[in-house]
Amino acid sequence: MSRAMGLKINRPRRGSMGVYPRKRAADIVPRVRTWPEVNLGKPTLLGFAAYKAGMLHAVVVEDRPTSPLYGKEVVKAVTVLDAPPLFIWGFRLYTLDPTNGYKRSIAEVWAPELPAYLRRVLTLPEKVDVDKQMKKVEEFKDVAVDVRALVATQPHLSGIGKKTPELLEIPIGGVPSVDERIKFAVSLLGKTVSPKEVFTAGQLVDVIAVTKGKGYQGVIKRFGVTILPRWHKHRKGHRRTGTIGPQAPAVMFTQPRPGQMGFHQRTEYNKRIIKIGDNGAEITPKSGFLHYGVVKGPYILIQGTVPGARKRLVVLRYPVRPPKKAPPAAEPQVVWISSQSI
């Protein structure tokens, strides 16, 4: 196509092919497919789950030495995550299946005493024989390659008035030894884990959540296709593509078409934790967060935005691709936090 016809030769395609198919997520609870290998010198959970409450703005001292505003106060938008402690109701051992190379569960241990609210999502046994389950762990621990904690959220401690918990698997990492991971998992059985036991303020995390659902949308909003001129030769439409493809093949899946927009699982890498607190009253507006409520207990402040609507479950994970020039690991100096939600 020549320049005389008014088109750029190198115009990129509309919309990314890297996020196909653009359909609704299978579950509102994020499914994490990749976990990093981290060496911290001590065992720890590699992730945490929290509820998105809203956004605020905070005055923070810029601590990046390469920034022209280094040492000065800057205003940053922050997302508030309501982070009640996670309940550890069990753990699993995984080995590699020799036939296909996938991980396969070989042993599972449950906590001896389980809270009643787990009955909403689990069929609880009358009695848990921990000794019998631990014998199976001892039998298979030599071939185990992964240890994962079975955790349940505690939404009744959050501000959303919900009772049914979400169940997740979070790997235990930080040390290469499987024995140390198993001992750590046993020590957590029947206990709760707070966000301060997993992350520290100043570090980077990956944020995984299901985005806001927009329903069925056209190509203008869904792909950013250019609106056609509104004159008589475009009488067949303006908010549409000029062509949906050639005569053959009959359907070009790469062509922008109307369809589902939003409610997709997305991952945003290397978000910085500004602050982790224990008292949600410190950051909750007087009238509560709009469409959420009151943050009662532990909370996490994330710099910038986070996918999803208010009340949505967000999974935080140790970064799988940390930048070569990471920001300072020290806790940022927060001067002031607004009391008015965005």
Swiss-Prot record:
Gene3D superfamilies: 3.30.1430.10, Ribosomal protein L3, domain 3, Translation factors
GO cellular component: cytosolic large ribosomal subunit
MF terms (GO), sorted A to Z: rRNA binding; structural constituent of ribosome
InterPro entries attached to this UniProt entry: L3_arc_euk, Ribosomal_L3_dom_3_arc_sf, Ribosomal_uL3, Ribosomal_uL3_arc, Ribosomal_uL3_CS, Transl_B-barrel_sf
Keyword RNA-binding belongs to the record: yes
Pfam families to which the protein is assigned, alphabetical: Ribosomal_L3
Assembly with partners or alone: Part of the 50S ribosomal subunit. Forms a cluster with proteins L14 and L24e.
Family indicated by similarity: Belongs to the universal ribosomal protein uL3 family.
General function of this protein: One of the primary rRNA binding proteins, it binds directly near the 3'-end of the 23S rRNA, where it nucleates assembly of the 50S subunit.
Protein name: Large ribosomal subunit protein uL3
Natural source organism: Pyrobaculum islandicum (strain DSM 4184 / JCM 9189 / GEO3)
Native organism taxonomy: Archaea, Thermoproteota, Thermoprotei, Thermoproteales, Thermoproteaceae
Gene: rpl3
